[in-house]
Amino acid sequence: MPETIIESLDNEGRGVARHDGKAIFIEGALPQERVVFSSYRRKPNYELATAGRILAANALRVEPRCRHFGICGGCSMQHLGGPGQAAAKQRVLEDDLWHIGRMRPEVIFPAIHGPSWAYRTRARLSVRRVPKKGGVLVGFHEKRSSFIADMDSCEVLPLSVSALLPLLRSLIGALSISDRLPQIEVAVGDGVTVLVLRILQRLTPEDESLLRDFAEAQGVQFWLQPGGPETAQPFHPIEAPTLSYALPDFGLRLEFRPNEFTQVNHGINRMLLRRAMHLLQPETGERIVTEIHKREDVF
């Protein structure tokens, strides 16, 4: 297999190199690394590839924490530590500003960092019955594939949600409509977890009983979505706390529905708002008008 030296990262976290006059985009490779690569798609001007052996590693390379990394398509940069990821994304942003808008910022503030693990408060999990895998799979799609990753944990989801993955596989496998439930939307607020089940067929009374028992045992809320997003409604418990998250610096609490937009990382959102208000330095009596996407968020 050919080898090359990585020059940079693209906006999808792939290493970028030049080889035989072509741009090569290599998954799993980092800048300044010398890698052996294998191409899986060839075009006249570029190739898409995966890294094989790392002959000379970047000093910031780390061992991926998740044992599903490399197969699951939910993450692409676990082989680069958190500070390295932030620096790489900043460079991509600076390059985009220049190449698209011919802009070079006069001042760049330090990147805001948050936890690298168990931070993701939203997720769309795919569901599929796969007899060859022993039953129902619940998780993200595999890389470059319509197959669902065979996973029983996720390092970026909250620990309580990650622990639900094997339990959900068993639960859905016991439903009469297990092959008519293609998706679970996960939304996590402060102390509240909602699972929206996309169903293509009505539940039986036995199915409903199983869902109620699971919700009570695991402390989650089930919603059902028989059609488009607007059809999502609470199933059990009917009377339950609303999804929300607090902005304690400003005495605010934002409420949202599970299928409405919020930032995936609530902690980072709080820090962004704190920095924005510090930069604006509003005086007493001044009003600040913000553009709020779908009303629930501020960034």
Predicted regions and their residues:
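Accessory RNA-recognition modules of RNA-modification enzymes
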Residues: 1-299
